[in-house]
Amino acid sequence: NEAEPQVLYTALHHAREPASMGQMLFFMWYLLENYNRDAEVKKLVDSRELYFVPCVNPDGYRYNQTTNPSGNGFWRKNRAMNQDNTQGIDLNRNYGFQWGYNDIGSSANGEAETYRGESAFSEIETRALKELCIKHHFNIAVNYHTFGNILIIPWGYNDSLTKDNEEFNILAKDFTKYNQYNVGTATSTLNYQVNGVSDDWMYGDTIAKNKIFSFTPEVGPAFWPSRQEIGQINQQTQYMNFSAAWNAGSVAHIEESSPEIIEPAEGDLRLIITRTGIQDNDIKITASCDHPDQIVIDEITPFRLNMAETRTVKVRYHVIQSLAFQENVHFTFHILTGEYSEIIVSDKKFLGTPFWRDEANHTDYWSSSINRPLELNS
């Protein structure tokens, strides 16, 4: 369905980073095995187009498998022969945007591990991904690498931020909600520049194709993690993969930030709404409580937000029949935008009408003396 938001996942640009592929295969199997068992998985798959390239560099990966069948092969580049009889091009220095910008972020030396090749897109592997991106309309791309537990955003070729830095960071904050990866540009996370990389081209080239919000997660603690660490990596990247898929379309998140005690007659519940999704759509919120005969809640008019925008929404409630002292009230809020939805429950307490109340914003009801610094006027 061409109307469905499209997402690209890639792994193994570098041959010695198998955990990047392992977590992707784990995610793919999870979707397949749970499609008919988990309503959320089914809704995601039915409303998104997900494209997976688990091994961008098959020749390099096969070489490591041949030389080190038990693991720990450290060949990085592909296996192409260069004109100077050296071997291998770093595929993640071979993309066309700011290719060869300088010799700091990539190398002109064929023996170097960051050798960028004779020209931009000289390699069949990067040309294949270029054609894939031109053919499709990816809103988000996630190009997995190892290692370091970080999430890299453009730009890589220099130290400047993109004009969409706020949008990149709101997406990255959602991606890393649970794994808490460190987020930033290559310089801020790795302490060095990179040029000719996938993220810069996917985001920066808007002539050959659309703009893609492209990210590079560097997963795990090592190039060849232990068996136990592999399982941890697979779990830590699950939410990131789901978040990338959802955020390619319409997504808005909801939080509730009101006092625990509800007013005796009427009051407002404060909701904080943040749009993280790329596609614009109506945001619809419904509210209910477990005392519908005693508390009436006003309807909330649908609205829209810009990407990365946050808004506080006040939800008015009316207590039409008093509740018992200290009775618990559970409010349920449901947010829907496009196919994405969230439900949160907020627990409040009803205390009734107080005997006396002071907002403490002035001292009109108070007096002081030497022996009694502050006392209530009778």
Residues covered by each model-derived region:
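Intrinsically disordered, low-complexity Pro/Gly/Ser/Thr-rich segments with frequent PxxP/GP/PP motifs
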Residues: 294-324
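Active-site-adjacent structural elements in enzyme catalytic domains
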Residues: 1-79, 129
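Metallocarboxypeptidase
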Residues: 67-266
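Terminal connector regions
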Residues: 318-353
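Extracellular glycan-recognition surfaces and repeat-rich motifs
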Residues: 355-378
